[in-house]
Amino acid sequence: MNPNRKIITIGSICMVIGIVSLMLQIGNIISIWVSHSIQTENQHQAEPISNTNFLTEKAVASVTLAGNSSLCPISGWAIHSKDNGIRIGSKGDVFVIREPFISCSHLECRTFFLTQGALLNDKHSNGTVKDRSPHRTLMSCPVGEAPSPYNSRFESVAWSASACHDGTSWLTIGISGPDNGAVAVLKYNGIITDTIKSWRNNILRTQESECACVNGSCFTVMTDGPSNGQASYKIFKMEKGKVVKSVELDAPNYHYEECSCYPDAGEVTCVCRDNWHGSNRPWVSFNQNLEYQIGYICSGVFGDNPRPNDGTGSCGPMSLNGAYGVKGFSFKYGNGVWIGRTKSTNSRSGFEMIWDPN
């Protein structure tokens, strides 16, 4: 083959290879483009998608606390809790408190207390001996824990208070203001729902313990008047934090303060403090229509402090050592009574529960 034909042949072969290579590249480009188009189409293809959002909340069980059962028969008592607040307060932040009490819902028990707006071993704790001051508040914390700013919940401005749970929400009652014009503020689930104004303008005050709830209604007893003479006493019926009925007791020669109330067989019984002239405790029992009966615990085991030595009981005020007094409680059961009282007859020291079957 002459040189010219060789050159032409080699050039033709190179041209064919180049054309084939070009066609392969074009095919590759077309393949990539088609593949990309298919993926893009799939990404934008409309498909029915279920996008239902289910909002889940922690359900809080609501019940009706009927209170229709009678008190359980028991043979003794056991200690439930102790917070050791004074000991812990020597190093930790613990409130200066008085008037503590426990109240339970169907889900939890809480300790309620009246603070003095100060901590133990702090400069503001000096002079915190007054029963009524603008610094006092009702607060609560889990039962058994020392009351501190870190575990306590504000409930109400108060120097006298009560609280209870109806099966749905907490009801709190906080009394504050001047002695001649105090006001009780009712809160239900933390919201102010009603008020009760002092009707005798002489230190309106209430239980310093839990109110009692029966079939969705809650009941409390309040006092307005002298602490050493005849005063005025009212029972209040509340529903969802609002007063729906009240009645003033016709109770001459009786003195009711700081009542301790409990439901019993669909009714409510309260055992109270006579600060006027009784070393035994007055009681009032009423139904849900506020029809009531009154009396004094007749037992010769006297429950107040100061008090005389045990002896012959009286169904009226036992006047021996009858002046002054202390909050306390008793549980009437059948013809007998469980009496809670101080061990000392003349000082607020010690505690004991005594069963008097008569």
From Swiss-Prot:
The lineage of its organism: Viruses, Riboviria, Orthornavirae, Negarnaviricota, Polyploviricotina. Residues 1-6 are intravirion. SUPFAM superfamilies: Sialidases. This is Neuraminidase. Intact N-terminus is essential for virion morphogenesis. Possesses two apical sorting signals, one in the ectodomain, which is likely to be a glycan, and the other in the transmembrane domain. The transmembrane domain also plays a role in lipid raft association. Residues 71-358 are annotated as: Head of neuraminidase. Its main location: virion. InterPro entries: Glyco_hydro_34, Sialidase_sf. GO terms for molecular function: exo-alpha-sialidase activity; metal ion binding. N-glycosylated. Residues 11-33 are annotated as: Involved in apical transport and lipid raft association.
